């Protein structure tokens, strides 16, 4: 389960106008959409590749639709993720891994002619680990059929530090096509 508990934002008047939003800053507290995901490992091999499939659904429960923060539409997606260690230390505390993703993404739109948009999703990236630190970088996006801003490409980076079952995460995302925005986030993850 993934959920944006609280978001505070600030954007320029130009960005507000491009998004047809009302405010440039968050005037009230609000919550984000809820995403429920299931992951299934279908192959685990040191010699070949590891492979997982996932099924995901996003609710339409987020707030501040008037400021283009979340959507009032559900979506779902399925994907296959494969990865392989390119290098691993003898003690297993350090590694470099390559991974790739391909899938299908579907979401509801507010277009009266095309009530739904579908896309092929893709991604490729690398992950480096050293003791409790993990640095991941990848290039990912999807390719929708309407070609109306539905073909974004993002360069995503994530630095995490794990202490026992607690993870502190810092993320940076750079939009390269259709979604030309910079995003920074700080997160806490509790592993059960």
Predicted regions and their residues:
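Sequence/structural signature of outer-membrane beta-barrel proteins
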Residues: 4-8, 43-45, 57-67, 85-89, ...
